[in-house]
Amino acid sequence: MSNTVNNPTKVITGPNTRWSYCNAWEAKAINGGTPKFSVSLIIPKSDKATLKKIKAAIEAAYREGEAKLKGNGKSVPALSVLKTPLRDGDVERPDDEAYADSYFVNANSTTAPGIVDADRQPILDHSEVYSGVYGRASINFYAFNSNGNKGIACGLNNLQKIRDGEPLGGRSRAEDDFADEAGDEEDFLS
């Protein structure tokens, strides 16, 4: 946590952050762009501490990136008119139950995030990390000005899985799929 003191644009989310659209093991390209590792971090609106840290980090990234945001223009656009990564799930994803009563941040990186468990031991089993788990994320915010688009973006540093959750995206777990079939072998043999 001491790194966040020296870096005002870095945030460690709370442990009740849910991961969605989790591409932590393999970089994926969107619309032919650069392949990136990414995750949508769903943050409950009740996690006021994490939301406060994210808002402060976005403001710090804005201040640090004023020259970049100004570009060739005469003035720096106000933060309120820029695209920022903290979005309201109730507004932008009203039909997705996973985003209800939550904010979300899409974080990405061209380099793979470090992934550890609750005891900070590396997770090597890819099936342990999926869309729907809960955990912390180390993220950083930075200003961008590219092809006329200006704003604040979110970089993905590392992930810490805290606990399992219901898989998102319709994927079921093998343990759940076959839970009701456990006693059927006896019928087959008799």
Give residue spans per PLM region:
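OB-fold ssDNA-binding interfaces and closely related basic DNA-contact patches used
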Residues: 1-104
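Acidic, gly/ser/pro-rich intrinsically disordered tails
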Residues: 1-9, 166-190
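Beta-strand/loop nucleic-acid-binding surfaces
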Residues: 106-124
